[in-house]
Design a protein with these regions (language model features):
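N-terminal leader/linker segments that initiate helical-solenoid repeat arrays
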Residues: 2, 20-83, 87-91, 341
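Helix-start (N-cap) detector for alpha-helical repeat units in TPR-like alpha-solenoids
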Residues: 59-60, 93-94, 127-128, 161-162, ...
């Protein structure tokens, strides 16, 4: 009996020791693992695996699976498949581009650049390789190399809308807005549904408070009705041009489509505060902004200032203090508190 009891104690102790050393899996980690399991058991991946079992020397299948692995963020597997595709057939530019895509997805810009530069030399007629390389040059701010590479692509095909858009983006970042406008306009001539090009043209003209901006924002929304940034930019331009009632209407329409576009709440509040002097309405919209983002110091300050205008010193003081608890260097809130006292 004593022996049985001793064995029982040992088993209990061993079980306790094992359970104490088991790794703790958080809910987030479990959800991530479950999500990955679903992806890795997806019909697309299963179909490719089945095809590769019956045709293991097909480079195109490895390339497709590599692209799928990129989507699933399984980068080691993606690199392996891309390299297999290249080993099986090194005469296809797309396989090299897929390998570059894997490296780029991992933010490995040096390896991405090396692969794309080799690809551009090996396949000088590949506009896809040239465009990806020029985009990489743009990202790392090698603007001259980017322009030269874009021009090579345009010599092969002068109708690449993306090439003109990228040139416009480079000129815009370089401060040459005239050339930026010219390139962006060419982009929308080549592709009249190029939303980003319309939007960028709108932003350039909006900075000049030129009404032409409205046409470009409207075109962006025509090509993509869910482009909320274009709706916001349109409303902001109305506000900047003194069309306050129209701006409020546009902001409210934006919030109907996307209730979380919080800058719209703040801007409506600012119009009621600074222009219409309707402090109660201003508080209403600043409160909405705070409800969506409780760590926004400017919204607390603006609401506090509105309360101060209504003579509610206690609420004003609370908001100023909250503002400073988030950003101790928010000098306007410090001044506001001093003025209340």
């Amino acid at each position: 009996m004593r022996t049985v009891y001793r064995i029982f104690i040992i088993v209990i102790s061993f079980s306790f020791f094992c359970s104490c050393n088991e790794p703790v899996v958080t809910k987030q980690e479990k959800e991530k693992a479950d999500s990955l399991s679903i992806k890795l058991n997806s019909p697309e991946l299963k179909a490719l695996n089945a095809q590769l079992l019956s045709d293991p020397s097909n480079p195109d299948l490895y390339n497709k699976r590599s692209q799928l692995y990129i989507q699933y963020k399984q980068f080691e597997e993606a690199v392996g498949d891309a390299k297999r595709a290249i080993r099986l057939d090194s005469s296809v530019a797309t396989y090299f581009i897929t390998l570059a895509d894997v490296y780029f997805a991992q933010n490995k810009t040096r390896q991405t650049k090396e692969v794309l530069e080799r690809t551009a030399v090996k396949f000088p007629e590949s506009t896809e390789a040239l465009m990806k390389l020029s985009e990489l040059y743009f990202i790392v701010k090698q603007y001259q190399q980017a322009i030269e590479t874009i021009n090579k692509a345009l010599k092969i095909n002068e109708n690449i809308a993306r090439a003109y858009y990228l040139k416009g983006s480079i000129y815009r970042e370089s401060g040459d807005t005239s050339k930026a406008i010219s390139s962006l306009e060419t982009a929308v001539e080549q592709d009249n549904s190029f939303t980003d090009a319309y939007y960028d043209l709108g932003i350039i003209y909006a900075a000049r408070k030129n009404p032409l901006a409205f046409d470009y924002f409207n075109n962006a929304l025509r090509s993509n009705g869910t482009y909320m940034d274009a709706s916001y930019a349109k409303a902001k331009l109305m506000q900047d041009m003194g069309k306050y009632d129209e701006a409020i209407t546009e902001y409210q329409a934006l919030l109907t489509k996307d209730k979380n576009y919080n800058q719209a709440n703040y801007n409506i509040g600012a119009i009621y505060l600074d222009v219409k002097k309707d402090y109660t309405k201003a508080i209403e919209y600043f409160t909405k902004a705070i409800e969506l983002n409780g760590e926004w110091p400017a919204a607390y300050f603006a609401r506090g200032y509105s309360y101060a205008k209504l003579g509610d010193k206690e609420q004003a003081s609370n908001d100023y203090k909250k503002c400073l608890s988030i950003d101790a260097n928010f000098s306007e809130a410090t001044i506001g508190l001093r003025e209340l006292n």
